[in-house]
Amino acid sequence: YFFAVNIAEEEACDIDTFNTIAYAAILHDIGIHEAEEKYGSSAGKFQEIEGPSVAKELLKDIELQEEIKNRIFYLIGNHHTYDKIDGIDFQILVEADFLVNIYEDEISRESIKSIKNKIFKTKKGIELLDTLYLNNSNL
């Protein structure tokens, strides 16, 4: 969440986009437990299948425009499918997710460089990636 809203602030996103990013960042992995129960796996493709319905249940009583809710569900249902990135909200969510996953998954410096070249586009996302992982001589 922190990385997503930090990048969104730097990108000067409008309030609807910012809210979409914030909710999606909090909820994007919400399908993990359902995926593990149904498929015995928390793989991204299963999270994408299960996540939107779990998020719909959680957000049903939250006052948000339907368009924003639907975009949140779309982002949750596609956040591991990088060729579907179709907007700044999706771009920021993916970059923020990578910033966390690189640390959690102990991704190699060479792989980080590849991710940077293939995925990262926002100025703040690139700055965070460089500062946290590529400018650090301990990696």
Per-range role (PLM):
Residues 2-14, 27, 64, 79-139:
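Divalent metal-dependent phosphate-bond-processing catalytic cores, especially two-metal-ion Mg2+/Mn2+ enzymes
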Residues 42-46, 87:
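Residues at secondary-structure transition points
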Residues 1-4, 45-61:
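An active-site-proximal "capping" alpha-helix that borders the catalytic cofactor pocket
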Residues 13-23, 62-76, 89:
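Acidic/histidine metal-binding catalytic segments
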Residues 18-40, 51, 73-80, 97:
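His-Asp-centered metal-binding catalytic motifs of divalent-metal-dependent phosphohydrolases/nucleases
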